[in-house]
UniProtKB/Swiss-Prot annotation:
Native source species: Mustela lutreola
Keywords: Electron transport, Heme, Iron, Membrane, Metal-binding, Mitochondrion, Mitochondrion inner membrane, Respiratory chain, Transmembrane, Transmembrane helix, Transport, Ubiquinone
Recorded superkingdom: Eukaryota
Locations listed in the record: Mitochondrion inner membrane
Binding site for heme b b566: H97, H196
Recorded topology in the membrane: Multi-pass membrane protein
Taxonomic lineage from the root: Eukaryota, Metazoa, Chordata, Craniata, Vertebrata
Protein name per its UniProtKB record: Cytochrome b
Residues where a ubiquinone binds: H201
Encoding gene, per UniProt annotation: MT-CYB
GO biological process: mitochondrial electron transport, ubiquinol to cytochrome c
C-alpha cells in the first residue's frame, strides 16, 4: 500500500516541501534562516492576534489600551514584548538571509530573489505601521515624518499624503487604517512566502560552493529538519532572553510618552532595523533625492543579478569579492549607527560617505572586482 503521506493531495504538498525534498548535502547554517523567518512570522501572527483582542485603534484610547495589556491582561506584558522584540528577531533573520543570498549568489534564482524583495518591502511596511499603533511620541512623529516623504512626489504629492492620512494631519483616521493594514499584511506576507518557496522548489536550493548539486542530494527529513529545530531553539532562546531580561533594549524611551502633536521629540528616529535606510535618506539635502535614495537602497537588490559578472556563482572561492562583501557589511553597520545620531558634524559627512560607499560597492566595485578575479584565474 502506498503511504498516505505521499498520495493525499494535502499531505503530498507538505511531504514534497518538508520531508522528501531533495536537498544539497553541504548546505551550512546560513541556509537555516528561511525556516527561522517562517517561525518568526508564526510568532508575530499569534502574538499579534492576542494583542489585537485587547487593543483599541482610537487616538484617545490606543496608548492606554497598550498600558492595559501590559498591566492588567494575563501575561499581556510577555505577549506585547514578544511581539515587539519578535519584530527585531524577524529583521535580524531577514538581513542575514539577504546577506547569505548576496554572498553565495542565490540571487541567480531571479524569481525567488524578486519575490524575496517584495517580501522585504512588505515586512518593512508592516513593521512601520505596527510601530505607529502604541501611539507614543515616536509612533506619532515617526508616522508624520515618514508619510510626509510622499509629499516630495511632484504634482500629486500633497494630495497623496492627505489621502493616506485621511485628513490634514496624522490622526484618528490614520491610526485606524494603519491598524487595519497592519493586521492584514502578515497574511499577505504568508501567501508571498508560499510563492517564494514554490519558486525555490522549482530549481532546488543553492549551496555554499555555488556548484550544481544535482548529483549529491539528501532527503530534507531527518537531516535538515533536525538542523532547523536546533536553529529554532536558538532563535527562541535569544528572543526569550531579550524579552525577559531587557525588553526595552531595542525600543525608544520616547514611546512611553503619549503622542502629543504640539511637542516634537528632540531626535525623531525609527526602530533600529530602519536606521541604515534613514541615514541614506538624511544624507541627501534634497527631499525628493532623499526619498529616491531611500527606496533605491532596497530596490537596488533587484538589479544585483544583472550585475553578476563573475564566472563563479558563490563568493566562496573569491577572496577579493569577500573583502568587498564584508566592507559592505561594515558600511551598513556604520549607516545604522549614523541613523541614530543627531544631524550635526561629524555625523552628516560620515553618513554621506557611507551612503556613497554603499551604492559604489553594489553598483561599481563588485562587478569590476569580479571581472578582475575572472582574469586572475587565467594567470
Amino acid at each position: 500500500m502506498t503511504n498516505i503521506r505521499k498520495t493525499h493531495p494535502l499531505t503530498k504538498i507538505i511531504n514534497n516541501s518538508l520531508i522528501d525534498l531533495p536537498a544539497p548535502s553541504n548546505i551550512s547554517a546560513w541556509w537555516n534562516f528561511g525556516s527561522l523567518l517562517g517561525i518568526c512570522l508564526i510568532i508575530q501572527i499569534l502574538t499579534g492576534l492576542f494583542l489585537a483582542m485587547h487593543y483599541t485603534s482610537d487616538t484617545a484610547t490606543a496608548f492606554s489600551s497598550v498600558t492595559h495589556i501590559c498591566r492588567d491582561v494575563n501575561y499581556g506584558w510577555i505577549i506585547r514584548y514578544m511581539h515587539a522584540n519578535g519584530a527585531s528577531m524577524f529583521f535580524i533573520c531577514l538581513f542575514l538571509h539577504v546577506g547569505r543570498g548576496l554572498y553565495y549568489g542565490s540571487y541567480m534564482f531571479t524569481e525567488t530573489w524578486n519575490i524575496g524583495i517584495i517580501l522585504l518591502f512588505a515586512v518593512m511596511a508592516t513593521a512601520f505601521m505596527g510601530y505607529v499603533l502604541p501611539w507614543g511620541q515616536m509612533s506619532f512623529w515617526g508616522a508624520t515624518v515618514i508619510t510626509n516623504l510622499l509629499s516630495a512626489i511632484p504634482y500629486i504629492g500633497t494630495n497623496l499624503v492627505e489621502w493616506i492620512w485621511g485628513g490634514f494631519s496624522v490622526d484618528k483616521a490614520t491610526l485606524t487604517r494603519f491598524f487595519a493594514f497592519h493586521f492584514i499584511l502578515p497574511f499577505i506576507i504568508s501567501a508571498l512566502a508560499a510563492v517564494h518557496l514554490l519558486f525555490l522548489h522549482e530549481t532546488g536550493s543553492n549551496n555554499p560552493s555555488g556548484i550544481p548539486s544535482d548529483s549529491d542530494k539528501i532527503p530534507f527529513h531527518p537531516y535538515y529538519t533536525i538542523k532547523d529545530i536546533l536553529g529554532a531553539l536558538l532563535l527562541i532562546l535569544m528572543l526569550t532572553l531579550l524579552v525577559l531580561f531587557s525588553p526595552d533594549l531595542l525600543g525608544d524611551p520616547d514611546n512611553y510618552i503619549p503622542a502629543n502633536p504640539l511637542n516634537t521629540p528632540p531626535h525623531i528616529k525609527p526602530e533600529w532595523y530602519f536606521l541604515f535606510a534613514y541615514a541614506i535618506l538624511r544624507s541627501i539635502p534634497n527631499k525628493l533625492g532623499g526619498v529616491l535614495a531611500l527606496i533605491l537602497s532596497i530596490l537596488i537588490l533587484a538589479i544585483i543579478p544583472l550585475l553578476h559578472t563573475s564566472k563563479q556563482r558563490s563568493m566562496m572561492f573569491r577572496p577579493l569579492s569577500q573583502c568587498l562583501f564584508w566592507l559592505l557589511v561594515a558600511d551598513l553597520l556604520t549607516l545604522t549607527w549614523i541613523g541614530g545620531q543627531p544631524v550635526e558634524h561629524p555625523f552628516i559627512i560620515i553618513g554621506q560617505l557611507a551612503s556613497i560607499l554603499y551604492f559604489m560597492i553594489l553598483l561599481v566595485l563588485m562587478p569590476i572586482i569580479s571581472i578582475i578575479e575572472n582574469n586572475m584565474l587565467k594567470w
